[in-house]
Amino acid sequence: MKIAVLLSGGVDSSVALYRIINKGYSNIKCYYLKIWVEDELSYIGNCPWQEDLNYVEAICNKFNVPYEIINFQKEYYNKVVSYTIEELKNGNTPSPDIFCNQRIKFGAFFEKINSQYDLVVTGHYAKIQIKESKFLLKQAKDKIKDQSYFLSHLSQKQISKLYFPLGTLLKSEVRQIAKNINLPNKDRKDSQGICFLGKIKYNEFIKYHLGEKKGNIIEKETGKIIGIHNGYWFFTVGQRRGIKLSNGPWFVIEKDLEKNIIYISHNENYLKQAKRKFLVHEIHWINDTPTNFENFKIKIRHGEKKYSCKLKLITNNLMEISLNKKDQGISPGQFAIFYKNTECLGGAKIFKIIE
């Protein structure tokens, strides 16, 4: 069996490689996907990904496995970065990591390697199960690290080629394995944030592409102007961090795109923003469209929290979702991801909040 392993230089993908080798497989080649964009590099002034490449080389040398660097900068910009910029311009909250997996890691990469490999291994926290000749995407044992949310838009064809060796482990167990076998990156911290940014701060990326535009920050309850911001695209509804005003904490309650106004409040559960019903479109199912939607739960962001809900399919590409509890951070552009027990069934893009 020929196996391709995607290595990022992090602990997770390195332990995934070790576990596949430990199972007795030897016909293995590793790949590092180069997806950062030249403009961002020149803007920051250095190459924050060189450390990744150094670790990839060290890991492959340790296990005597060949590796190759594949450049997907152009594809990534066209298929993921441009989408992110457009969503921010429209005042939405993008989820670029969903499309990074669908269009690049398991899209452009699969096209590049064609049918050279029987299996592609990564360090994602998720599980694949075969049932009645169908491949199911399941949540990982570690519900905090579970990444099924970001894998929700993969196809049957993509999932059929994948294996996630970390799906049955807790993050603490992965760290312990790394220490036990003395991996070169055993003490390396986990990466945070969007996959293509590396050490570039998210706000620096936004500023580079969309610039700055001064606008008022208004307290929702009083209507008073209490500050100035640099552009609505730097803020997400429900956001708490990054609001640099005294007498906090403050929460972003609403955005007026036309007037470039950010409304904030001390009250996290401000009724205007606590919603439970919304419309989604661009619906994607990993397998066939379900015949009924009973006992479904959804996530509206990455994390442990799931909501019980009622789903009403209006057309094949339009659905109304009613949560059993209100949520103060629902925002157009986010993705609602469908679950039944621990199976991830797919997802859809939120585009209109109803009530």
From Swiss-Prot:
Annotated EC: 2.8.1.13
Site, Interaction with tRNA: residue positions: 124, 334
Entries under CDD domains matching the protein: MnmA_TRMU-like
Positions of the UniProt region annotated as Interaction with tRNA: 145-147
Disulfide-bond pairs as recorded: 100-195
Main location as per UniProt: cytoplasm
Any one annotated GO CC term: cytoplasm
Biological process (GO), any one: tRNA modification
Keywords: ATP-binding, Cytoplasm, Disulfide bond, Nucleotide-binding, RNA-binding, Transferase, tRNA processing, tRNA-binding
Highest taxon listed in the record's lineage: Bacteria
Record's catalysed reaction(s): S-sulfanyl-L-cysteinyl-[protein] + uridine(34) in tRNA + AH2 + ATP = 2-thiouridine(34) in tRNA + L-cysteinyl-[protein] + A + AMP + diphosphate + H(+)
Binding residue positions for ATP: 6-13, 33, 123
Localization, UniProt: Cytoplasm
Pfam families from the UniProt entry: tRNA_Me_trans, tRNA_Me_trans_C, tRNA_Me_trans_M
UniProt xrefs under InterPro entries: MnmA-like, MnmA-like_C, MnmA-like_central, MnmA-like_central_sf, Rossmann-like_a/b/a_fold, tRNA_2-thiouridylase_MnmA
Enzyme active site: 100, 195
GO molecular function: ATP binding; tRNA binding; tRNA-uridine 2-sulfurtransferase activity
NCBIfam families: PRK00143.1, trmU
Biological role stated in the UniProt entry: Catalyzes the 2-thiolation of uridine at the wobble position (U34) of tRNA, leading to the formation of s(2)U34.
Protein family membership: Belongs to the MnmA/TRMU family.
HAMAP family given in the database record: tRNA_thiouridyl_MnmA
Identification of the protein by name: tRNA-specific 2-thiouridylase MnmA
Organism this protein belongs to: Borreliella burgdorferi (strain ZS7) (Borrelia burgdorferi)
Lineage: Bacteria, Pseudomonadati, Spirochaetota, Spirochaetia, Spirochaetales
